[in-house]
Amino acid sequence: MTNYIFVTGGVVSSLGKGIAAASLAAILEARGLNVTMLKLDPYINVDPGTMSPIQHGEVFVTDDGAETDLDLGHYERFIRTRMTKRNNFTTGRVYEEVIKRERRGDYLGATIQVIPHITNEIKRRIIAGAEGVDVAIVEIGGTVGDIESQPFLEAIRQLGTEVGRDHAMYMHLTLVPYIAVSGEVKTKPTQHSVKELRSIGIQPDILVCRSENALPSNERSKIALFTNVADKAVISLKDANSIYKIPAALKAQGMDELVVQRFGLECPEADLTEWEQVLYAESNPVGEVTIGMVGKYVELPDAYKSVNEALKHAGLKNRLTVNIRYVDSQDIESKGEQILHGLDAILVPGGFGERGIEGKIAAAKYAREQKVPYLGICLGMQVAIIEFARNVAGMESANSSEFDPQTPYPVVGLITEWLDADGSTAQRSEASDLGGTMRLGSQLCHLIPGSKVHDLYGSAEIYERHRHRYEVNNNLRDKLEASGLKVTGLSTDKRLVEVIELGDHPWFVAGQFHPEFNSTPRDGHPLFEGFVKAAGEYYKNNN
């Protein structure tokens, strides 16, 4: 039977529930347990696919094509279980399903209510997502007290009762602020947060207290007394300069043992050797590089969370500290390419819309002409192709039909049909809805032997995740290749261009897919490793 750990948050948002939950999952996995994680988001959007990255951060894409919360990226970076569509759902998704069933007549004329119909659907989805594992860690988005979270909290209260105390635990994460003027930590916000949680019938079994510094034992005992939580179950989680230190910090306080004892699980001690190796590499770099991230959502780094992490992972593999300099592509348009001076490499990540596009094209041009290592991801590949078409292939005014429908050279256009990795044919048009209609999920890519990417991956066939509507226009592909563009990766049916390279450049690679979603701190990713290595070589040669 699956054991459940329900994770809630209190006092303020953005405390790191996802990191704390994923760190606990990493320890349990290191004890040989089969672990999965779920994220329940209270917002009414069906999924985050059409939400602004400035408001919500990155959209993380799973192998099976789900557009999900960025916390699922944390989950995959901390544990080896692959997330799927079942691991993330929203209020909007729940209501959509319940209303669909009501219209179909499944409820036999009943009056549809939050309790029991909405809460039952939430429970059904939790159970389905947790099927077949030893432990399922279920994170509830938002904070206790939010009106949007109430159906989810009621659902996990009911589910905890139904599976029984031996198979359910509640973990609550709160803030314990430090008041510098008085030199004291304040436990009252945590006490009130737990009081709020208990008022709806949930008694936390573990309290994780976020604070600037480690909590003194007397303060932990005080919190335990007023929240009815055992002393040993009040966990102090101080600020850390690396999220990959959190598993060891939680293990040192015996959090995993609390879980194992509660569920009566027999398993060996956690072996955190892999995480120790990650921390050693992070703490002992032999050099550093500065990589320019050219985008239009740079005011919120979480909009590029997986790319940021993938660069750090590649730095670990190369024993280099990767400093990321965020460059607003609109600043390149207004101030010129001098903004890019001093960079050891340039990365243009995915994105949508016309704003700032000419700045990204200028960044690709600068990288090509100055022989600066370049990695283009999704839109980053498309702007590289537009730049090459305009300035090398003689196609003046070349563009994507997304940005200029009247361009005489639409080198990038809407994909109207493609073959998915499972062999099914997908079709789209300009009239298709924005949400959930892109080429999504893991797709097979054929790499050309002898190419840089083939050498990096060490394989002729790879699987990478996609999230896009536009692709290279095959009608103009021959002209691009005749001018020196190398197409080194093709789709399942070998019709869509997936990877390009420049043969006369030390390191210029761009892919239509999102390799960042497959990068982890323990394993890295070959494309990012090669990119950061090239940045290190560029630094050596120019300093």
Curated annotation (Swiss-Prot):
Family annotation (Gene3D superfamilies): 3.40.50.880, P-loop containing nucleotide triphosphate hydrolases (3.40.50.300)
Sections of the chain in a coiled coil: none
EC number: 6.3.4.2
Region (Amidoligase domain): 1-265
GO BP terms, alphabetized: 'de novo' CTP biosynthetic process; pyrimidine nucleobase biosynthetic process
Catalytic activity: UTP + L-glutamine + ATP + H2O = CTP + L-glutamate + ADP + phosphate + 2 H(+); L-glutamine + H2O = L-glutamate + NH4(+); UTP + NH4(+) + ATP = CTP + ADP + phosphate + 2 H(+)
Annotated GO MF terms: ATP binding; CTP synthase activity; glutaminase activity; identical protein binding; metal ion binding
Subunit-structure text: Homotetramer.
Protein name from the UniProt record: CTP synthase
Biological source species: Pseudoalteromonas atlantica (strain T6c / ATCC BAA-1087)
Lineage of source species: Bacteria, Pseudomonadati, Pseudomonadota, Gammaproteobacteria, Alteromonadales
Gene: pyrG
